[in-house]
A protein has these predicted regions:
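Conserved beta-strand positions in repeat-built beta-propeller and related beta-rich domains
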Residues: 31-37, 70-74, 110-115, 150-155, ...
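Short loop/turn segments that connect beta-strands within beta-propeller blades
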Residues: 43-47, 80-84, 122-126, 164-168, ...
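Blade/loop signatures of beta-propeller domains
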Residues: 1-7
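Blade-level signature of beta-propeller repeat domains, shared across WD40, Kelch, NHL, RCC1
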Residues: 182-228
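A short beta-strand motif characteristic of beta-propeller blades
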Residues: 7-15, 48-53, 85-91, 127-132, ...
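WD40 beta-propeller blade core
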Residues: 40-41, 77, 119, 161, ...
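Beta-rich, blade/repeat-based domains predominating
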Residues: 15-28, 55-65, 93-105, 135-146, ...
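Beta-propeller domains
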Residues: 36-44
């Protein structure tokens, strides 16, 4: 397993009126953060808040290229970012405690924190398509370059983990500094992760380590036909 210390490139916040960052996503231009009863759009260049959507935003956030998805208690809300309207709701599995949320290859991936699980869900019905066991609390989920990553946070220890999307085996780990937690995880599609900072009210940008092309190909996990 590859292991490294996190390279924090920069951080934003705390933001006015924001006491906790619950989830993070990126729409290609703006970083969206879930802050309780609002979704705030942040300029990743300046860190300025550009706009807000009044919607329950209690945990993970995702973007499918057109719509935002936001965890609110026992459901996922599908939101039109242009109008701010909730246009559909998707039931979550029983159990509660959901955290990270990601969109990949036509399906939703949701973390269940204290149960240490990641679910792949049908975005129309909420049906569970796959369950992955984790060894740590799951506090954020993202996909990039065919790789499944999730955040963890227990006590003062937090890290980012690349895992096999079928077995949950940890393939790579990026350790955050002591006391710096991750609550929400998103990739920019390149070499950067956006990490929510929980009660710090901050968003941090962490560099995704580069790997040799041969090593990278050998250790990547890709989605199977069920998620395409």
């Amino acid at each position: 397993m590859n292991q490294s210390a996190a390279e924090i490139i920069r951080e934003f916040g705390p933001f006015p009126g924001v006491h906790k960052v619950n989830g993070v996503t990126y729409d290609g231009q703006q970083v969206w953060i879930a802050v309780g009863e609002k979704l705030n759009a942040i300029d990743p260049a300046s860190g300025k808040t550009l706009r807000s959507i009044d919607v329950a935003a209690h945990a993970g956030t995702a973007f499918d290229g057109q719509h935002l998805f936001q965890i609110a208690d026992d459901r996922i809300q599908k939101i039109d970012p242009k109008t701010g309207h909730v246009i559909a709701t998707i039931p979550l599995p029983v159990g509660g405690g959901f955290s990270g949320l990601a969109w990949a290859e036509g399906t939703l991936w949701v973390g269940q924190c204290e149960d240490r699980k990641i679910y792949q869900l049908d975005p129309q019905t909420g049906t569970i398509l796959r369950t992955i066991e984790s060894k740590r609390f799951v506090t954020g989920v993202t996909w990039v370059d065919g790789e499944l990553w999730h955040g963890t946070w227990e006590g003062d220890e937090s890290d980012l983990r690349r895992v096999d999307s079928r077995t949950g085996e940890v393939l790579e780990k990026i350790e955050m500094p002591p006391g710096v937690g991750v609550s929400g995880l998103e990739s920019d599609g390149g070499d950067q992760f956006f990490c929510g900072g929980g009660g710090s009210g901050k968003v941090r940008i962490v560099r995704r380590p580069r790997r040799g092309s041969a090593a990278g190909r050998g250790s990547e996990s890709t989605l199977d036909s069920k998620s395409k």
